[in-house]
């Protein structure tokens, strides 16, 4: 079975946290908020008549910046490091730099005939011909290294995005 993990950067101190759960809470005053619980944390919630959560005890939860939230891909790089959305990877044979993304994508060859794909993929951003590289993440993970992520290390993208 695939390991489900989310990570995000804490708003209070900037530390990265991860857990198997991600909770979104819509606060009328502050808008949508994102929380990642401590591992094995228990939660006490208050519900309204429609069973919507209207409040919860957030003592065991970390409020995280929504822009930094990413899911674990289920894959590791060539050194065994877990790969998450928004990680920056490097292909050492050609020095190509890419970002792990989630969504719909098309590979450069054959997808006009067979259609597109959906899931985790590599958005290649630097190199001689990044648009010619295939994007399916699983193809690359055993031969690339995770260098960082777009939130802590934007300089890794070479000013391209």
Where would I find each of the regions flagged by the language model?
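Secondary-structure transition motif
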Residues: 1-161
């Amino acid at each position: 079975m695939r390991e489900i993990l989310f990570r995000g950067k804490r708003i209070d101190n900037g530390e990265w946290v991860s857990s198997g759960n991600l909770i979104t809470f819509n606060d009328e005053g502050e808008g949508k908020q994102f929380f990642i619980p401590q591992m094995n944390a228990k939660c006490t919630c208050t519900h309204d008549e429609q069973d919507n959560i209207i409040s919860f005890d957030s003592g065991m939860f970390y409020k995280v910046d929504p822009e930094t939230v990413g899911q674990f891909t289920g894959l590791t790089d060539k050194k065994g490091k877990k790969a998450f959305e928004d990680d920056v990877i490097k292909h050492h044979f050609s020095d190509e730099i890419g970002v792990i993304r989630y969504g719909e994508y098309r590979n450069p060859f054959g997808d006009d005939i067979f259609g597109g794909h959906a899931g985790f993929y590599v958005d290649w951003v630097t190199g001689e011909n990044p648009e010619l590289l295939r994007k399916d993440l699983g193809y690359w993970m055993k031969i690339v290294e995770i260098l960082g992520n777009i939130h802590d290390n934007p300089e890794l993208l070479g000013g391209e995005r």
